[in-house]
Amino acid sequence: MNYENYIHNLFVDDEIFKYSINEIENQHEISFYIRFGSVLYNLNHDYGSIGLRKMVDYINSEINQDITLKEIKQIIKFFKLICHGMIISYKITFEYYKCLLKYDDIVFINSCIELADRNPLDLERFEEIVINKKNG
């Protein structure tokens, strides 16, 4: 049985269906990064950058996924921000969160997430608004 067609028939509006599917996909992606961030955070805490470099090598060679040390550090920062009170919205993708990783002000970050949560914006427009909001 094609569950996507079955689920689609439950919805009258195509936009609601697409929105719901996107939210489920975002939830899976963000949940993965939270769990992965937890592992990386502990690895970094216990072994420092040597452990992170070994993790990068392991992922690239054994799991056959291209990942850089920079991406690993972004995921750790994402996890740390959650630990310090950053809210999670499944209405936006991880790419939106990556725009906010350069900031440390949780109140500012949460206000940006709430803005994106209320008003769906494309990523480029979101980045513009974040920069303008921070500067003025």
Task: Give the location of each predicted region.
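Alpha-helical structural elements
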Residues: 1, 91-92, 121
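Basic, low-complexity segments
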Residues: 1-27
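Generic detector of bulky aromatic hydrophobic side chains
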Residues: 9, 77, 111-113
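Short, Lys/Arg-enriched phosphate-binding patches
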Residues: 17-107
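Helix-turn-helix/homeodomain-like alpha-helical modules used for DNA recognition
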Residues: 106-136
